[in-house]
């Protein structure tokens, strides 16, 4: 079982490394998101580059990247320790993809896919927190940052055995938003609807 647990964790990283934002833009002949807009291969930048439908497809793909390895792990009944590792490596794959020179997205949708499989309450908290923040202030990045700080508290309450991986994932999300935090501080961050 340890062998399969390690295999799933490795699979999670490689699946996470498939960047839907880059591939979809390449197939549909949109600009490379790494060289356009915020230069982030994530759904918010895709929204600005290619529109809502393409952005939604990127979000769905990124959610599945996080959810599929976790579902597989649950099905094979691997231990919570390896499930936690699978969760972290899914997000690491998205953020630092081996197929794209380790330059990836910020992991929000993939983290959502991971946390949804851990506990439905966590996905509800993520959606609510992100939506309320974005509707209040208009910044997708701020929604992600606020949610990253909040979600470990709920993980501790609902699924305490996954608190550590949740803290690691949340920390990674905040780290990947370092440039956004600087722009927010200096009032230079673009709102979600601005191209």
Swiss-Prot record:
GO biological process: phospholipid biosynthetic process
Chief place of localization: membrane
UniProt pathway: Lipid metabolism; phospholipid metabolism
Localization, UniProt: Cell inner membrane
Catalytic activity: an acyl phosphate + sn-glycerol 3-phosphate = a 1-acyl-sn-glycero-3-phosphate + phosphate
MF terms in GO: acyl-phosphate glycerol-3-phosphate acyltransferase activity
SMART domains, A to Z: G3P_acyltransf (SM01207)
Coiled coil region boundaries: none
One annotated Gene Ontology cellular component of this protein: plasma membrane
Membrane topology designation: Multi-pass membrane protein
Keywords: Cell inner membrane, Cell membrane, Lipid biosynthesis, Lipid metabolism, Membrane, Phospholipid biosynthesis, Phospholipid metabolism, Transferase, Transmembrane, Transmembrane helix
Membrane spanning stretches: 2-22, 54-74, 80-100, 107-127, 132-152, 155-175
Domain of life of the source: Bacteria
Pfam families according to UniProt: G3P_acyltransf
Enzyme nomenclature, EC number: 2.3.1.275
Protein's job: Catalyzes the transfer of an acyl group from acyl-phosphate (acyl-PO(4)) to glycerol-3-phosphate (G3P) to form lysophosphatidic acid (LPA). This enzyme utilizes acyl-phosphate as fatty acyl donor, but not acyl-CoA or acyl-ACP.
Record text on subunit structure and interactions: Probably interacts with PlsX.
Similarity comment: Belongs to the PlsY family.
Protein's recorded name: Glycerol-3-phosphate acyltransferase
Organism whose genome encodes this protein: Blochmanniella pennsylvanica (strain BPEN)
Source organism phylogeny: Bacteria, Pseudomonadati, Pseudomonadota, Gammaproteobacteria, Enterobacterales
Gene designation per UniProt: plsY
């Amino acid at each position: 079982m340890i062998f399969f647990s390690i295999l799933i964790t490795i699979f999670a990283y490689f699946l996470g490394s498939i960047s839907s934002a880059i591939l979809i833009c390449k197939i549909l002949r949109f600009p490379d998101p790494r060289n356009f807009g915020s230069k982030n291969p994530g759904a918010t930048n895709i929204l600005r580059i290619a529109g809502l439908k393409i952005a939604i497809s990127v979000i769905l793909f990124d959610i599945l990247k996080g959810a599929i390895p976790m579902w597989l792990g649950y099905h094979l009944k691997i231990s919570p320790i390896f499930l936690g590792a699978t969760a972290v490596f899914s997000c690491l794959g998205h953020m630092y993809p081996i197929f794209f020179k380790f330059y990836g997205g910020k992991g929000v949708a993939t983290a959502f896919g991971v946390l949804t499989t851990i506990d439905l309450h966590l996905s509800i908290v993520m959606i609510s927190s992100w939506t309320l923040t974005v509707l209040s202030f208009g910044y997708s990045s701020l929604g992600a940052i606020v949610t990253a700080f909040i979600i470990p508290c709920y993980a501790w309450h609902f699924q305490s055995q996954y608190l550590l991986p949740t803290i690691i994932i949340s920390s990674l999300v905040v780290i990947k938003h370092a440039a956004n935090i600087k722009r927010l501080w200096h009032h230079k961050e673009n709102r979600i609807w601005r191209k």
